């Protein structure tokens, strides 16, 4: 997806109608935090959107930076943090670029439903960026649509959404091949989730930087 496409969505569509925008953090992320598997630390939310998950983490003691290619989303995210009274930093940055805007390194990086917006030929650059900004032993958590997800026509690797965006649906093997050169994969499985408007099957990948 191009930056202008994402910014167009945030500019022209109410937040409550954006399918991936949820004020409540996903159960899988909450579980990582509440179990102590990921403890409060320096964290980056890759493709943070309106910043809801970054705000949640900041409220539980994490030092969080959120980045997104959409300037409109970043402005909304900062307002959300201010409204909730938490300290979080939000930057306009393209995860497929050089990430010069990100001058720090982190102990935890995560993306929730970002990777399926990135086509296979561009994923290596993204994963290299994610690894580069993590400290040695840092954790990385990725969730993206699985190829067996029943939504958006229910078949095909590339599927068009009602917003006009095109998503790529990955298999577990594809993600293993993508991540293993850069990360130790601690957990890779397919889980069901409930999003705002539909149920999905997603790839859940929890890793440690090599």
What are these regions (language model features)?
Residues 132:
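Short, conserved loop/helix-junction motifs that constitute active-site signature segments
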Residues 110:
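A conserved beta-strand element that flanks and buttresses the S-adenosyl-L-methionine
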Residues 113-117:
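Short catalytic micro-motifs in class I SAM-dependent methyltransferases
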Residues 1-44, 50-102, 118-129, 139-210:
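Class I (Rossmann-like) S-adenosyl-L-methionine-dependent methyltransferase catalytic domain
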């Amino acid at each position: 997806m191009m930056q202008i496409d994402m910014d167009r969505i945030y500019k022209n569509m109410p937040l409550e109608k954006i399918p991936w925008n949820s004020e409540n953090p996903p159960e899988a992320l909450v579980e990582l935090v509440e179990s102590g598997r990921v403890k409060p630390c320096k964290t980056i939310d890759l493709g943070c959107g309106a910043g809801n998950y970054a705000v949640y983490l900041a409220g539980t003691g994490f030092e969080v930076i959120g980045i997104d290619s959409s300037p409109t989303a970043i402005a909304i995210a900062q307002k959300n943090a201010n409204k909730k009274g938490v300290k979080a930093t939000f930057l306009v940055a393209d995860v497929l670029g050089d990430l010069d805007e990100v001058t720090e390194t982190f102990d935890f990086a995560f993306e929730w439903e970002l990777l399926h917006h990135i086509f296979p030929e561009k994923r290596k650059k993204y994963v290299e960026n994610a690894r580069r900004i993590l400290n040695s032993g840092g954790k990385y958590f990725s969730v993206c649509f699985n190829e067996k997800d029943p939504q958006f026509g229910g078949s095909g690797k590339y599927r068009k959404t009602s917003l006009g965006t095109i998503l790529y649906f990955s298999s577990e093997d594809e993600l293993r091949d993508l991540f293993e050169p850069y990360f130790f994969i601690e957990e890779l499985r397919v889980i069901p989730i409930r999003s705002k408007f539909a149920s999905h099957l997603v790839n859940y990948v929890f890793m440690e930087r090599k």
